[in-house]
C-alpha cells in the first residue's frame, strides 16, 4: 500500500551546505522530518554540484515521518549573474543596464536548465532565459 502524503515543502539550499540551523532546521522540524537524515541525504546528493550554488528542492513528507526529495537545477538568475559576473541585477531594468550577455551563454544556460523548463526545444528555452535577462537589466548581444 502506498504511503499517505502529509505535505510538500519547497526550499532553496546551497549545494553541499545543508545543516540543521535556520532556515532548514525549523522548516523540517515543525513538520516532523528527521533533520539530520535530510541534511546527510541532501549533501550526499548535491556532492557533484558546484558548492554553494542555490539548489531548489521539493521535499515530500509522509505521515509515517519519512520523506523523499527532488532536486532541481539552480535558478536562471544564478546562471545569468554568474555568466555576466554580476552581484545583482539592475535596480531599474529597461532604463539602466546592469551588463551584457551573449547568445552563446544564453544557449548554454538553456541547455543546462532544459529539464526544468516548460519548453519544447532549446530555442523556446533561450527565449525564456532572454526574458529573465531583460527583467534583470541585462542586454542580450550577438
Curated annotation (Swiss-Prot):
Instruction: Provide any one GO MF term from the record.
Output: large ribosomal subunit rRNA binding
Gene3D superfamilies named among the record's database cross-references: Ribosomal protein L11, C-terminal domain, Ribosomal protein L11/L12, N-terminal domain
Superkingdom field: Bacteria
List the keywords (alphabetical): Methylation, Ribonucleoprotein, Ribosomal protein, RNA-binding, rRNA-binding
Post-translational modification (record) = One or more lysine residues are methylated.
Q: Which Pfam families match?
A: Ribosomal_L11, Ribosomal_L11_N
Example GO BP: translation
The record's section on SMART domains has:
RL11
**A Gene Ontology cellular-component term:** cytosolic large ribosomal subunit
SUBUNIT field: Part of the ribosomal stalk of the 50S ribosomal subunit. Interacts with L10 and the large rRNA to form the base of the stalk. L10 forms an elongated spine to which L12 dimers bind in a sequential fashion forming a multimeric L10(L12)X complex.
Job of this protein: Forms part of the ribosomal stalk which helps the ribosome interact with GTP-bound translation factors.
Q: Say which family it is in.
A: Belongs to the universal ribosomal protein uL11 family.
Protein name as it appears in the record = Large ribosomal subunit protein uL11
Name the gene that codes for it: rplK
